[in-house]
């Protein structure tokens, strides 16, 4: 399955399970950790936990058996590592505080070339 298809499936799973403010960020040429980052909000700690567990379960059905959840002990953040797509699930206040969308959406500065006189 292509990475873009995996991303679309994840977005659909999140939407079907009432995740809020689902945002996808293209990380190609910005990071080697993944091709895409998806950020979404949940309404409660339990909702975040459910979203992360549902994602892993649904991705297993698509043949992605080794996805994992980080932040199991956190009440306001979960991360699902789906290899080329990473998913951050936040309580709205924590999402606003960390503002990953702004950080990862900005252009990467290009190195300046100096010529010697």
Explain the meaning of each model-derived region.
Residues 115-117:
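Conserved small/polar residues in nucleotide/adenosyl-binding loops
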Residues 21-26, 65-69:
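A short linear hydrophobic-aromatic micro-motif
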Residues 2-20, 46, 91-108:
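Long, contiguous binding/interaction regions
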Residues 41-54:
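Compact, glycine-rich, soluble single-domain proteins
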Residues 42-45, 83-85, 93:
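Helix N-cap motif at beta-to-alpha junctions
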Residues 12-16, 53-64, 105:
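Short, intrinsically disordered, mixed-charge
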